[in-house]
């Protein structure tokens, strides 16, 4: 990942990192708006997922997960930022005039050519069925159902491995370590998803975190008792239960019944 350097005039530019190769000006015919309801709230407005809310408005980019432009070569024109995922996307211009977005493969640069279909070269960014791939191939954007489009290994830095083929099925080792068997007629893209160092990227300031729709995380012991089961009153010792209920869950207290001792005198 190429890092763009700034003159350190403020703490945010001194500590933040920005990829200099990535643009953020999508094509109008490949984007559309989407409705965002209350972040982290249910239909009644109650918090169901903490530390979420706000964030910048997002436009959804139409990503080609099917890769159904068969045997038509395409060229990478731009590498762009997508606010809806942590991986980058790249704009492809195909030979028949079609323009589509795909996930950016690691190591792909502007000007590279890609193609999808059967018996295409085993090259980074090419999409082909698992039956045409040799064992040990690193792949991403893997189909589960034939023709539905890639559903596995799509996050930044994700990569799976083809470890076996037997009969009508192929065995994959997924990024989570799970070993899964799918139809070997399903297609996948060769290589690893780009933006591998996304977890090492420094945002530089709290405001950048809020743009992503992430709110501050506050410890329960510093809250008031009305706000959290672990909250305490000022001036009192912080003695709390060992395993308290989560925030917002009503405690069901059971009445303690004293056990009596029955003594029978004969």
From Swiss-Prot:
Location(s), subcellular: Plastid, Chloroplast
Superkingdom of origin: Eukaryota
One annotated GO molecular function: structural constituent of ribosome
GO biological process: mitochondrial translation
Compositional bias per record (Polar residues), positions renumbered to this chain: 7-24
Matching SUPFAM superfamilies: Nucleic acid-binding proteins (SSF50249), Translation proteins SH3-like domain (SSF50104)
Cited SMART domains: Ribosomal_L2, Ribosomal_L2_C
Gene3D superfamilies: 2.30.30.30, Nucleic acid-binding proteins (2.40.50.140), Ribosomal protein L2, domain 3 (4.10.950.10)
Alphabetical list of PROSITE patterns matching this protein: RIBOSOMAL_L2
InterPro entries: NA-bd_OB-fold, Rib_uL2_dom2, Ribosomal_uL2, Ribosomal_uL2_bac/org-type, Ribosomal_uL2_C, Ribosomal_uL2_CS, Ribosomal_uL2_dom3, Ribosomal_uL2_RNA-bd_dom
Pfam families on file: Ribosomal_L2, Ribosomal_L2_C
Record flagged with keyword Cytoplasm: no
Keywords per UniProt: Chloroplast, Plastid, Ribonucleoprotein, Ribosomal protein
GO cellular component, as recorded: chloroplast; mitochondrial large ribosomal subunit
Renumbered residue ranges of the record's region Disordered: 1-24
Protein family according to the UniProt entry: Belongs to the universal ribosomal protein uL2 family.
Annotated PANTHER family: LARGE RIBOSOMAL SUBUNIT PROTEIN UL2M, RIBOSOMAL PROTEIN L2
Subunit structure: Part of the 50S ribosomal subunit.
Name of the protein in its database record: Large ribosomal subunit protein uL2c
Native species: Nicotiana debneyi
């Amino acid at each position: 990942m190429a890092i763009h350097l700034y003159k350190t005039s403020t703490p945010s530019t001194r500590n933040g990192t920005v990829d200099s190769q990535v643009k953020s000006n999508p094509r109008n015919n490949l984007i559309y708006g989407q409705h965002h309801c209350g972040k982290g709230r249910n239909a009644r407005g109650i918090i169901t997922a903490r530390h979420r809310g706000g964030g910048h408005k997002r436009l959804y980019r139409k990503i080609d997960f099917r890769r159904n432009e068969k045997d038509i070569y395409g060229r990478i024109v731009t590498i762009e930022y997508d606010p809806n995922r942590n991986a980058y996307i790249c704009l492809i211009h195909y030979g028949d005039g079609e323009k589509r977005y795909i996930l950016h493969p690691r190591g792909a640069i502007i000007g590279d050519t890609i193609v999808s279909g059967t018996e295409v070269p085993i090259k980074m960014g090419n999409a082909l069925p698992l039956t045409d791939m040799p064992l040990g191939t690193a792949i991403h954007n893997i189909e589960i159902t034939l023709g539905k489009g890639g559903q596995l290994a799509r996050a930044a830095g994700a990569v799976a491995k083809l470890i076996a083929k037997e009969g009508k099925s192929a065995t994959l080792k997924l990024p989570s370590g799970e070993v899964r068997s799918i139809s070997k007629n399903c297609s996948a893209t060769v290589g690893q998803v780009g933006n591998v160092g996304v977890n090492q990227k420094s945002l530089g300031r709290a405001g950048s975190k809020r743009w992503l729709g992430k709110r501050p995380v506050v410890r329960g012991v510093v809250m008031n008792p009305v706000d959290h089961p672990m909250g305490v009153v000022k001036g009192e010792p912080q003695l709390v239960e060992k395993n308290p209920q989560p925030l917002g869950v009503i405690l069901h207290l059971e009445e303690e019944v004293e056990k009596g001792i029955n003594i029978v005198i004969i």
